[in-house]
Amino acid sequence: MPKAVIFDLDGTLVHSLPGLTDALNKTLAEDDLAPLDEAAVKRMVGEGAGLLVARAFAAYGLGRADDADDTATQARLARFLAHYAPDPLAGASVYPGALALLGALAARGIRLGVCTNKPEGPARALLEGLGLADPIMDVVGGDTLAQRKPDPAPLRALLDSLGVEADQALMVGDSPTDVATAKAAGVPVVVMSYGYSREPVASLGALAVFDDFASLGDWLGFPQPGGDRLGATPALSENPA
């Protein structure tokens, strides 16, 4: 049984795509650019707000999709955050079963954290507003350190904060970024199938792929009575018990 479980936020605990899409489209509209639909934005998220903005404008031939640090992208990022940060709860919802599993884990003394590329302020506001903050012991966001995922530094900082070693923790994410981060930090990792991955989740090399939190709870040894179970696809036969 892991001593700590560390979750990604967007696409793992929380469906935040509507609010991200709305803020991004407001930013695009300021430059007289057409709005993007949620399917397009979904393919752009996962590596921080800077790259989200860079990818959105690159779709219109403005800047490079892989460069979040140039002057123009930084200015666009500031405008995006001005739209998003005041109300990160807009259109956001908790994935079914997430709160129940967090509560069950915390009740058994499992230390919980969130490691996200979302800026720390909006991330904490989102957790608080959606009722997820109480069991979460710490949050490391995309601007907490100089590095962000897939660099292992944010995850390692969270391990230190929670007081656990890498092999005593489990990372739960939804994307190649989460898997790469966990592997670089030496943390076992599983992924949720419903999130914002741009690649097939079965190909990411995680220990297991879960379709819902009830199935993840079963695997962890915390079954949720009455929870909807869509299934799990283990990549390995063992569980962390």
From Swiss-Prot:
Catalytic machinery residues: D8 (nucleophile)
Record-level GO BP terms: DNA repair; glycolate biosynthetic process; reductive pentose-phosphate cycle
Class of the enzyme per the UniProt entry, highest EC level: hydrolase
Pathway where it operates: Organic acid metabolism; glycolate biosynthesis; glycolate from 2-phosphoglycolate: step 1/1
Keyword list, A-Z: Calvin cycle, Carbohydrate metabolism, Hydrolase, Magnesium, Metal-binding, Photosynthesis
InterPro entries: HAD-like_hydrolase_sf, HAD-like_sf, HAD-SF_hydro_IA, HAD_sf, PGP-like_dom2, PGPase_prok
UniProt EC number: 3.1.3.18
Function: Specifically catalyzes the dephosphorylation of 2-phosphoglycolate. Is involved in the dissimilation of the intracellular 2-phosphoglycolate formed during the DNA repair of 3'-phosphoglycolate ends, a major class of DNA lesions induced by oxidative stress.
This protein's name: Phosphoglycolate phosphatase
Organism: Rhodospirillum rubrum (strain ATCC 11170 / ATH 1.1.1 / DSM 467 / LMG 4362 / NCIMB 8255 / S1)
